[in-house]
Amino acid sequence: MEVIADRLDDIVKQNIADEKFVDFVIHGLEHQCPAILRPLIRLFIDILLFVIVIYIFTVRLVSRNYQMLLALVALVITLTIFYYFIL
């Protein structure tokens, strides 16, 4: 149990370090642009990070649960056929 707690502490420390690095990069990009464009740069970077996180989550979800997703798709197709052709 102690090994898991130590590993979680390491993950938290790494996440904090990664967040500081990303903030440093964003801060550097913001100061290279005119003041008028800074909010747009922040918005673009936030949207880009959001899309990356969604992509990683989707790839992980599909790769770990593809059997269940295929069964769900088959069920939806079957129910759609039943709804349109039988009812």
UniProtKB/Swiss-Prot annotation:
Protein name: Protein OPG096
Entry GO CC: host cell endoplasmic reticulum membrane; membrane; virion membrane
Membrane-spanning intervals of the chain: 39-59, 67-87
Conditions for induction: Expressed in the early phase of the viral replicative cycle.
Function: Early protein involved in virion morphogenesis. Participates in the formation and elongation of crescent-shaped membrane precursors of immature virions in cytoplasmic factories.
Entry keyword annotation includes Endoplasmic reticulum: no
Domain of life per record: Viruses
Membrane disposition: Multi-pass membrane protein
Quaternary data: Interacts with OPG158.
Family from the record: Belongs to the orthopoxvirus OPG096 family.
Disulphide bond pairs: none
Keywords associated with the record: Early protein, Host cytoplasm, Host endoplasmic reticulum, Host membrane, Membrane, Transmembrane, Transmembrane helix, Virion
Location of this chain's protein in the cell: Virion membrane; Host cytoplasm; Host endoplasmic reticulum membrane
